Amino acid sequence: MRSVGLSILVKKLKKIITAPVEGLGYELVGIEFIQSRQSVLRIYIDHEEGVTVDSCADVSKEVSLVLDVEDPITVPYNLEISSPGLDRPLFTARHYAQFIGEKVNLMLRMAIQNQRKWQGIIKSVDGESIIVAVNQKDEVFALSNIQKANLVPHF
């Protein structure tokens, strides 16, 4: 499945599973669909009191019911429900704004300065792009060019 088709699928999935997730009291943080021999639909949820294994099981049951009816994915896949974890994925401008000052790993769709992988500190967000301090230099990244972003946990 190409990137554009994948993007459309993720938008469709978000539309049909947001209500069941929020109905159980959780925030839908993001969705990843990884297509391979063993395709995976990964749904990240969060809650102010944390996410437990039982939370994930409850959400999995509700989401499975909706997916069985809507049937938006045409290939076999495994459903995973997960908390964002220490290396929390960032999906929206709001997520980046929430973690200003934190270290982030970025994977870009299209290279900038012949580079697709970047790491730095999130400095600001304007809705369309983010500014990340990379080696004491500010770099601007369009949100639309970010394929994947994760916080870098500190230990």
UniProtKB/Swiss-Prot annotation:
Coiled coil: none annotated. Keywords: Cytoplasm, Ribosome biogenesis. Belongs to the RimP family. It comes from the Bacteria. GO terms for cellular component: cytosol. This is Ribosome maturation factor RimP. The keyword Iron-sulfur does not apply. The keyword Membrane does not apply. Required for maturation of 30S ribosomal subunits. Gene3D superfamilies: Ribosome maturation factor RimP, C-terminal domain, RimP-like superfamily, N-terminal. InterPro entries: Ribosome_maturation_RimP, RimP_C, RimP_C_sf, RimP_N, RimP_N_sf. It is found in: Cytoplasm. It comes from Hamiltonella defensa subsp. Acyrthosiphon pisum (strain 5AT). One of its GO terms (biological process) is translation.
